[in-house]
Amino acid sequence: MADGSCLGSGPQLGLIALLVVLLFSAVPLAQSRELRFVTLVYRHGDRSPVHGYPTDVHKESVWPQGYGQLTQVGMKQHWDLGQELRARYKGFLNESYNRHEIYVRSTDVDRTLMSAEANLAGLYPPEGPQIFNPNITWQPIPIHTIPESEDQLLKFPISPCPAYVKLQEETRQSAEYINMTTTYKAFLQMVANKTGLSDCTLESVWSVYDTLFCEKTHNFSLPTWATADVLSKLNKLKDFSFVFLFGVHERVKKARLQGGVLVDQILKNMTAAANNASNGLKLLAYSAHDSTLGALQLALDVYNGKQAPYASCHIFELYKEDSGNFTVQMYFRNESGKTPYPVSLPGCAHACPLQDFQSLLQPILAQDWEEECQTTSFIMTEETIIGLTIGAIALFIIIVVLMLLSCNEPKDDGYQHVSDEGDDHETKGLAM
């Protein structure tokens, strides 16, 4: 009886196997793309209110460290983010801390500095020789900062910038701003009356929401006027205040003076990494504020209109593709425990070629920030101040010398008496 198998005999199987091997060897296997550089921009964790309001029964003393300080909840949020980053970049970053691979910069504010510390504790728990005390699963890792008054990279809005101030004045005359002011005029007045604030505007009301939000989060009682409807309106106005800062009117012009400054630095860092000029640096982290993320995302035109939550993180990943070209992928992590969601630059795919990424962002990059900000008429450099001081001293010396010379010259009497007898008139001489 004939065998019904279609596999054939042994020699035939060997021939088929050989053909399969030859076929796959002729088609090169795709190489995996390589992650080359990562930039993180994250907001600090949960904090106490930045300000109170006059009628608030919960004064600053109820917060263990006072206003604007990171809480234990915020510390845990950033430790969690550090753990998530450790898992995400396993195989890219060294398992243990390597100072050549990572650089962290923070604004010079307690809550951002402490958030960076908590983040690094989660990212790099000490291992082996890095353990200096077996009872402490932590190691010191440097965080760099500069004074707030000098920070023109992470502290927004950047000032002084007269051109930006002018744009904000124009924004207040925009239809959207006027409409919001008209719509919420009575509401803002009610909030002012209830809080005891003398001035409550679209630009300042965010602080009222912030205080109530922090108190609610930490289980403090809220005033009876702070109903769900009131909180909802305050939340909406708070979100508008962020858009007002960097959008609403002339978004691109504002970006050139604000968020574009940070974008420009991020692009320079990625370009250096693509050109193997980053000296082994793999990850650069910026610890900052919701206003930093707002300025950044509105400059990129990817802002979702909502205030960035605590410990949220905007991620830039630079990849080297099989072709040798580089691409940039962005992600936004805005919820703990959730995978960061992809963010695409308008006009480009999610994996955006680096050259296209740079080209699309050129309109928001200032060629000469000080000139565009018109700071030359506003800020005097140290050299200018020294020059003016020397000039003033020289002028003073010249005036003193001239006065002394004038005093030493012979003087004519201002009045002369006529000695004619019988004439008692005093004749006044001319003072020449």
UniProtKB/Swiss-Prot annotation:
Name the record gives this protein: Lysosomal acid phosphatase
Disulfide bonds: C161-C373, C214-C313, C348-C352
Cellular component terms (Gene Ontology): lysosomal lumen; lysosomal membrane; lysosome
InterPro entries according to UniProt: Acid_Pase_AS (IPR033379), His_Pase_clade-2 (IPR000560), His_PPase_superfam (IPR029033), Histidine_acid_phosphatase (IPR050645)
Lumenal side: 33-384
Signal peptide region: 1-32
Phylogenetic placement of the source organism: Eukaryota, Metazoa, Chordata, Craniata, Vertebrata
Membrane topology: Single-pass membrane protein
Annotated glycan sites: N94, N135, N179, N193, N269, N325, N334
UniProt similarity note: Belongs to the histidine acid phosphatase family.
Post-translational modification: The membrane-bound form is converted to the soluble form by sequential proteolytic processing. First, the C-terminal cytoplasmic tail is removed. Cleavage by a lysosomal protease releases the soluble form in the lysosome lumen.
Pfam families recorded: His_Phos_2
